C-alpha cells in the first residue's frame, strides 16, 4: 500500500510522514479517548499485519495524473511507434559512487552502534547506463558532474555502431535538455529520439534498480583494498551486469516498472 499523503498527517496535527507507535497511540487517544501502552499499540499493529519499514521517499511535487498518463498512454504509444520503426527502447540514468558510502545494515552488539572506518582518500566516480527489457545494457564511467556536452559525448558512445533506431527514455535533468543535446539529437536524423519521464518519478525508470543493485552488492559489501581504484571496481561491476542479460531482465520485474513491455 502507498504511504498516506502528507496532508493526512497534517490533518491530525502531525507535520511529518512517519507512523510510529507513539504517534498511533496519540491518535487513538485523540479519536477514541483510549489510553494504550506502546507495547499494546505494537501488538495491535501486528494483528493488522503491519510491520515497521523504512519508507521510500517521494517528492511532494510528483504529479499522479502525469504518472498515470505515462503508464497508460505515453509509454504504450512509444512501444507501438518503436515496433513500426523497428526501433529499440532503452531507459537511461546517471549515478554517483563513493568509496566511503555505506549501504545496507551490519550486525553489532545490541545498544552499541557500529562504526565504519572510512578510507582517508575519498574516491568518487560517476556512471551512466542504458537498459532495455530484453536484457541489453550499456554503460560508461566518467568524472565530475553531467553537462550538456558530456551528455552528448555519452550519447555518441551509446549510438556507436548501433544499427537500429533508438528511443531513449530519460529524466528531466537540465543537462538532458541542453541546446547542444537538442542539436545532436536533430543531427541523428531520427536514429535517436529522447523521451522524458514525468517529473519526480524516478521509480518509473528501471535503470534506478540497476544502481540500487550495484551499490548494494558492490563496495558496500566488498570494501576497496589498499591501492585499489574505485573507478576500476565500478567498471568491472557494471561490466558483470552487462554480461548477465538474465539479471538485467530481472530489473523489469519490479512492481514499479511493471508497466514496461518489450
Residue ranges and their predicted role:
Residues 52-68:
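Short Lys/Arg-enriched helix C-cap and helix-to-coil transition segments
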Residues 92, 155, 164-177, 200, ...:
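Acidic/histidine-rich, metal-coordinating catalytic segments
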Residues 85-89, 207-262:
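C-terminal anion-handling pockets and recognition modules
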Residues 9-38, 83-85:
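A short, amphipathic alpha-helix used for macromolecular contacts
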Residues 69-156, 259-262:
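Extended, low-complexity cationic-aromatic segments
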Residues 1-8:
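Short, small-residue-biased leader/transition segments that mark boundaries at the very start
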Residues 37-48:
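Major-groove recognition helix of helix-turn-helix-like DNA-binding domains
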Residues 56, 113-121, 186-206, 222-223:
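RNase H-like polynucleotidyl transferase catalytic core
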Amino acid at each position: 500500500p502507498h504511504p498516506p499523503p502528507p496532508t493526512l498527517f497534517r490533518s491530525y496535527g502531525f507535520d511529518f510522514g512517519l507512523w510510529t507507535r507513539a504517534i498511533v497511540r496519540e491518535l487513538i487517544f485523540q479519536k477514541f479517548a483510549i489510553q494504550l501502552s506502546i507495547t499494546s499499540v505494537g501488538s495491535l499493529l501486528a494483528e493488522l499485519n503491519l510491520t515497521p519499514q523504512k519508507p521510500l521517499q517521494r517528492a511532494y511535487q510528483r504529479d499522479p495524473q502525469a504518472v498515470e498518463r505515462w503508464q497508460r498512454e505515453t509509454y504504450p504509444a512509444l512501444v507501438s511507434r518503436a515496433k513500426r520503426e523497428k526501433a529499440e527502447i532503452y531507459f537511461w540514468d546517471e549515478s554517483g559512487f563513493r568509496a566511503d558510502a555505506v549501504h545496507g545494515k551490519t550486525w553489532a552488539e545490541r545498544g552499541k552502534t557500529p562504526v565504519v572506518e572510512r578510507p582517508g582518500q575519498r574516491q568518487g566516480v560517476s556512471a551512466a547506463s542504458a537498459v532495455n527489457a530484453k536484457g541489453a545494457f550499456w554503460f560508461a564511467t566518467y568524472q565530475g558532474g553531467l553537462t550538456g556536452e558530456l551528455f552528448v559525448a555519452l550519447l555518441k558512445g551509446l549510438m556507436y555502431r548501433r544499427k537500429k533506431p533508438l528511443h531513449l527514455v530519460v529524466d528531466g535533468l537540465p543537462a538532458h535538455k541542453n541546446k547542444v543535446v537538442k542539436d545532436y539529437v536533430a543531427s541523428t536524423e531520427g536514429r535517436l529520439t529522447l523521451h522524458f519521464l514525468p517529473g519526480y518519478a524516478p521509480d518509473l525508470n528501471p535503470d534506478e534498480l540497476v544502481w540500487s543493485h550495484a551499490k548494494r552488492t558492490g563496495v558496500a559489501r566488498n570494501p576497496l583494498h589498499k591501492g585499489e581504484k574505485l573507478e576500476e571496481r565500478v567498471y568491472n561491476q557494471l561490466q558483470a551486469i552487462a554480461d548477465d542479460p538474465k539479471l538485467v531482465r530481472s530489473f523489469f520485474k519490479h512492481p514499479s516498472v511493471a508497466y514496461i513491455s518489450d
